[in-house]
């Protein structure tokens, strides 16, 4: 191993910052008072431990309020790569959920609780409790509706299908205009934060289509509020997700829709945290209650339960917990290729026949890098890639870094690095493919890249339940993947489901018209290049991670 490369460099996990560099905010009144009334001041602690601001001119004392850092602050800060752990725990924890539930009872408030749960979280829970997907779904519905008092619980399938369809349609439009790829997915908040804070030059390539979590949140809050005759602010939306970074995504401020700027998700818990909640409050809540056998063996079809626990106007309720084809992160890369195939068949029926298409899989240097190529005979028509894990992401963004303009000077070290990379790249190509062939996976040359920060993608998210001591991580992951793949499928990419795709999109348009929700508000996100700190103190604090 090279002297400049240690084992620590191979770890995909990015530790949170131990110190926050964001200064406490002051409103204009506070600033005016401090500067103009008190003049020069000093901070002292009184006998009760409270901070005081004391004027050196007249001795006037002013109580200081505690500084608070929110998740939205973390999104706008470059002090650390990911969020401060304390912020996540404080604002998105099972304790906060229990606190909110108790406040509803104690204060007799009008707050209504609703929940959505991801495919990967269901698979993780089913694996941990050794149950089928249908059994775990029935028990989850019983837990949230009958025990915790939630009004609705839905799967994230409709939100994901809207995300998949819009992603594919946007790519097809770009493809036909001969765009300069690749487009990079943005449904992984860990990857998005990394790009915003460290590689802003890739932001123009990022897809602006929202993730299933956020689309589901907008639909669920809007429909629930309308049916119950309350405001969106009266709806408390809990989302069960496979990844802790989803907490940060839920806090990203809405840029579109002046009338609906409130968060679509109020609390994000992972499957791991849900288990912790159940362990700490086993006297009140049980996923596996004494009558569990009666619940799981009920003669009521699970599809009827999906309908019963969803808002009355929830779309395509029979498919609202269904799965999608492709990877266990949602299948974005695969669905783009298949939908583009369907587009070509419908647009050029005499030129393209379904039986002439195939998808070739080209492996990369490791199992977390795969390229998929849509072929018609021997002709490559489109391509996408799956890039999982921080190391593969780093390699991709290096390749996408803008080249140095002609005439500009570069340091000797940079030139040496460039030559070294070129040698390495050339060696890899020669070793993995015959001379002159195009068999080496290269995500940077694809139309689209499905990017997830976690190795193995969302099914292996940091919030998934850990394996028992006697089970290897590899076997546990395989078991979770098997559960995930057992979720009933509604394959949007299948030619026979083209009408279903049209139905989903038509319903989306009607929803936006009826409730005055713009297309951007429902479906589009945005990115922000985070400026790096320039003062030495902030740089020093931000570097300690």
From Swiss-Prot:
Record-annotated membrane-spanning stretches: none
One Gene Ontology MF term: iron-sulfur cluster binding
GO BP term, pick one: iron-sulfur cluster assembly
UniProt entry keywords in alphabetical sequence: 4Fe-4S, Iron, Iron-sulfur, Metal-binding
UniProt: [4Fe-4S] cluster 2 binding residues: 188, 243, 454, 458
Binding site for [4Fe-4S] cluster 1: 20, 74, 77, 80
Superkingdom assignment: Eukaryota
Cross-referenced SUPFAM superfamilies: Fe-only hydrogenase
Pfam families membership: Fe_hyd_lg_C
Entry-linked InterPro entries: Cytosolic_Fe-S_CAF, Fe_hydrogenase, Fe_hydrogenase_lsu_C
One Gene Ontology cellular component annotation held by this UniProt entry: cytosol
Purpose of the protein: Component of the cytosolic Fe/S protein assembly machinery. Required for maturation of extramitochondrial Fe/S proteins. May play a role in the transfer of pre-assembled Fe/S clusters to target apoproteins.
Family, as annotated: Belongs to the NARF family.
Protein name: Cytosolic Fe-S cluster assembly factor NAR1
Lineage, highest ranks first: Eukaryota, Fungi, Dikarya, Ascomycota, Saccharomycotina
